[in-house]
Amino acid sequence: MSEETPASSADAPVPPKKRGVPEGLWLKCPGCGSSVYKKEVEQRLNVCPKCDHHFYVSAKDRIAQVLDEGTFEPMGESLRPVDPLEFSDRRKYADRLVGEQKRTGLTDAAMTGVGMIRARRVAFAVTDSAFIMGSMGSVVGERLTRLIERATDDGLPLIIISASGGGARMHEGILSLMQMAKVSAALARYDESGGLFISVLTNPTMGGVAASFASLGDLVFAEPKALIGFAGPRTIKATIGIELPEGFQTSEFLLEHGYVDRIVTRKNLKSEIARAIDYCGK
């Protein structure tokens, strides 16, 4: 009687592959902690279907959400950031710019231009926190200034949606800080001409952006639960050693204290802007 030959690994039955859920179909909401279907969130303008948390939205998507389809005429696209200080921290600023441009598809942290909102012609700008935290350097400041001057010359309502957690861009030193004054001065001339400036604050709006143009609107709208302020809560506590009220930099707190005029959900933003333009006779 012959001995049995042990089965080789090649002869062993192959267990069926587990059919897992493809990656990227679900998101975890930072507002309520629920797992939510990504496609459903996108259909609701990147808002959680369970708690109405407002997720990040890119500058390009903001344009698609707020402006009438196909009406956006970009301005200042030829302007490109440079590295006049040859700045370097963990990475050379010049290399960082190239990396951010490839990653986001943007040339800098702001998109500006002219478009229509419910058939009303407006000057429109939006910053994007994905590009170096939406910080304001020379190009962002110049694009905004040229847009404001265009709005002044053409008598257009001005809409700026801010999503800037980085404030003035430290990589450009004083050249970025001066943009705060330059943009604010352009807004002062626009105001003297009788223009209507609607500033929309989203999460986050911080630093030099919050301390300049974002706070200068004739009307200041904010998305729900947006973080708005100059320095972050931990920085303030470490600097002055005082425990500040919980949520003191949220849009709801700022509405109660008169800094924000109205909290507007994303789905209502377009209609609220159009209504404000009509109400103000612009």
Predicted segments with their positions:
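Cys/His-rich microdomains that often coordinate metals
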Residues: S35-V36, H54-F55
